[in-house]
């Protein structure tokens, strides 16, 4: 198992495939290593997909300790161009669990 981003980056370097990227799971990264913004920035060229879930609880963004408004602004600032997907359990209903998206409307 890979428990840290550096392990995934080292594996990609060893394989040498330019078309393979890290799927950065924010929930697990926060649990295992923290420092989300710094880690994403450091490994930005190797990250191709980011999964969203808050911590603790693996619920939707805004229900835990991760400051998603800062993190989304940081992704914009550093020029992240990859995919972002959601992999969380809604704290209540699916409809209510999608409410966090309204904070992204500019």
Regions found by a protein language model. Give the residues of each.
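Histidine-acidic metal/acid-base catalytic patches
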Residues: 2-24, 28-106
């Amino acid at each position: 198992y890979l428990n840290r981003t550096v392990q995934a980056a080292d594996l990609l370097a060893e394989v040498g495939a330019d078309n393979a990227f890290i799927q950065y799971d924010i929930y697990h990264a926060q649990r295992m290593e923290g420092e989300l913004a710094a880690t994403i920035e450091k490994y930005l060229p190797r990250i191709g997909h980011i999964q969203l879930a808050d911590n603790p609880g693996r619920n939707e963004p805004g229900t835990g300790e991760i400051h998603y408004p800062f993190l989304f602004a940081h992704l914009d600032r550093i020029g992240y161009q990859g995919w972002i997907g959601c992999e969380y359990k809604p704290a209540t209903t699916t409809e209510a669990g999608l409410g966090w998206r309204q904070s992204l409307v500019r």
